Amino acid sequence: MKDDCIFCKLANGVFETNTLYEDNQFRVIFDASPATKGHVLVIPKEHYANVFEIPEDLIADAYKVAKKVATALKEVTGCEGINILQNNGEVAGQTVFHLHIHIIPRYEKGEMVQWTPGELDEAAVKEIIERSKGLL
């Protein structure tokens, strides 16, 4: 646990939170600034800044928790859909640099930012495929 990380403190019970679920690796809490009713965060108890730092087995476990929580939220809230997302880096919208997964119930009449689909750049795709060989 990092002493100066608010999410380390929230995940490890240093501060009181509205906890929806907890196990030995994760705590799921309600977002303090929710996008919708039922918006929660899956937070690992160990500190990892982003997806590039967390071990593969632990991120796999995090998404198992996310699925379990999303399933329960869908039933309890009656939402029509769910976004599961995780931001990495400031330009990607990460504001707290302790990895966390957002689970955001979506409602038919709800508002939420969506991206505008663009055009596929075949040359860029081919370049990314070629440059990724040996990395994956």
Segments (PLM) and residue ranges:
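HIT superfamily nucleotide-processing domains
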Residues: M1-L136
